[in-house]
């Protein structure tokens, strides 16, 4: 029998993925990953589960029950050190540099599709690795007649997770299975219900990858001390004080502390200046300073040819694809141009590129411009 190792999280998606693989005749084994230790990692402020049973332990119990239901072996592995060093410290460093990172993408790059794969292939020797992501893999024949995996969008466009997988290398996609790629979320729930899986009605996980729900301001304060600074309008008018520019992101409306400032429209973050620790805000969700027409993208991971310079891009999860024109600067950096202008293109976030339903690659948004002038987004 062909052996598959599936990542089991305790949620319904990975449970149905394991169920489908077994139904298709694979020899299935599962692995549960533990990647965060609240006490060891000083996760105190903003942690609503600090005095309760750790949510990861509850997820592990659900994974055990699912594996027992399906009659598959469950392994448990800790990647706490790897997660801290490769994901979380990169996450914190980005905030220190006034960027807005995406921990889910870092987590996929370094843990789920690196540390996990290394563990599974070394210890369990499967032919395939499977995950419960909403994505697809298709294969193209290269010039030397080898089959090359390409990351393709899921059928369920609302749940498609290729954005979070967009920085994986071609090597990381080798021998990967995504059993849910051609199913909708509703169909996945229905399969779980029809087969009495214990977590069929369990709500989807939210929050930071493997950490969970947190009060974001308080959570970051465990690792980034508050740095009081000025909140100003673009013309320099002082409005109030903030807790530190790294706590805010471009386009943010809530938790600005401007409730006492008279205004006709809601305030939005339109700029951040780290050297002076100044947060810039303006009124209205369509303020011109929120828009840009060019961005510099770095740390590129690209899969396939670079010949097509007219692609679509996604600068945040679930954003409708945007038409962009690429100008390659070197192997690792490019500029994207979008004359139609796009709102809240945020340094630190990932820009994923698409050619129809194929995700070609992605990079980190470094700088943002409008009509040749750099926006004060960092």
Curated annotation (Swiss-Prot):
Any idea of its EC number?
Answer: 2.8.1.13
| GO terms under biological process | tRNA wobble position uridine thiolation
Subcellular location(s): the record lists: Cytoplasm
Where along the chain is ATP bound? 7-14, 33, 132
Where, by residue number, is the active site? 107 (nucleophile), 209 (cysteine persulfide intermediate)
Q: State the top-level EC class.
A: transferase
Q: Name one Pfam family in it.
A: tRNA_Me_trans_C
| NCBIfam families found in the cross-reference section | PRK00143.1 (NF001138), trmU (TIGR00420)
What is the documented function of this protein?
Catalyzes the 2-thiolation of uridine at the wobble position (U34) of tRNA, leading to the formation of s(2)U34.
> What name appears for this protein in its UniProt entry?
tRNA-specific 2-thiouridylase MnmA
Q: What is the lineage of its organism?
A: Bacteria, Bacillati, Mycoplasmatota, Mollicutes, Acholeplasmatales
